[in-house]
Structure formats: C-alpha cells, structure tokens
C-alpha cells in the first residue's frame, strides 16, 4: 500500500498525475457552471419574454406573438452580451491596475 498520496509527498510523475486530475476537475466544474448559467439565462429570458409577448396562451402562437418573442429574446441576449462583456472588461482592467499597484510596492 502506497501512503505517499496521504502524506502529500509523491514522486514527480505522481505529482503530474495529481496536477492533471486537479486541472481536469477544474475544467469540469467550470464547464458545469457555464452550462448552469446558460440554462438560467435561457429560462429567465423565456419567462420575461413569454409574460410580455403572450397575454393569453392558446393552442398556437399568432404571427404577432412569434415576432414579439423573437425580438424580445434577441434583445435580451444582446443586452446580456453587452453587460457581460463590459463586466469582464472592467474586472480585467481592475486586475491589471491591481497588478501594477502591487508591482510598484
């Protein structure tokens, strides 16, 4: 029985394998979070646009309702993309400013 995994001390090859597993888990968690966020975005957009565009549900959608849903979903996703890219840019700028400030110390 190899106890090196319990002590945290391992051979170089074992360390690489552990690092690879850790990276694979990070990637899987990241992927699952992205999927959950996408599902949440679609659900929210559907709820908002459905309540706005379909006042009285029926057996089928009218042309007006279909057009409204299409436009509403497009605008919702466009707004999400604008907000998301602005947020990412802002966080990136703040990190860069923080790195510059740390380097100056």
Curated annotation (Swiss-Prot):
Biased composition range(s): Low complexity: 1-18
Tree of life domain: Eukaryota
Subunit organization: Heterohexamer; composed of 3 copies of TIM8 and 3 copies of TIM13, named soluble 70 kDa complex. Associates with the TIM22 complex, whose core is composed of TIM22 and TIM54. Interacts with the transmembrane regions of multi-pass transmembrane proteins in transit.
Disulfide bridges in this chain: 49-72, 53-68
Protein location: Mitochondrion inner membrane
InterPro entries, per the entry: Tim10-like (IPR004217), Tim10-like_dom_sf (IPR035427)
Any one Gene Ontology molecular-function term assigned to this protein's record: metal ion binding
Family assignment from sequence similarity: Belongs to the small Tim family.
Single Gene Ontology BP annotation: protein insertion into mitochondrial inner membrane
Alphabetically ordered keywords of this record: Chaperone, Disulfide bond, Membrane, Metal-binding, Mitochondrion, Mitochondrion inner membrane, Protein transport, Translocation, Transport, Zinc
Source species: Mycosarcoma maydis
Motif (Twin CX3C motif): 49-72
Domain comment quoted from the record: The twin CX3C motif contains 4 conserved Cys residues that form 2 disulfide bonds in the mitochondrial intermembrane space. However, during the transit of TIM13 from cytoplasm into mitochondrion, the Cys residues probably coordinate zinc, thereby preventing folding and allowing its transfer across mitochondrial outer membrane.
Any one Gene Ontology cellular component term annotated for this protein: mitochondrial intermembrane space protein transporter complex
Lineage: Eukaryota, Fungi, Dikarya, Basidiomycota, Ustilaginomycotina
Task of the protein: Mitochondrial intermembrane chaperone that participates in the import and insertion of some multi-pass transmembrane proteins into the mitochondrial inner membrane. Also required for the transfer of beta-barrel precursors from the TOM complex to the sorting and assembly machinery (SAM complex) of the outer membrane. Acts as a chaperone-like protein that protects the hydrophobic precursors from aggregation and guide them through the mitochondrial intermembrane space.
Membrane topology designation: Peripheral membrane protein
Protein name: Mitochondrial import inner membrane translocase subunit TIM13
Pfam family, one: zf-Tim10_DDP
Location of the region described as Disordered in the Swiss-Prot/TrEMBL record: 1-23
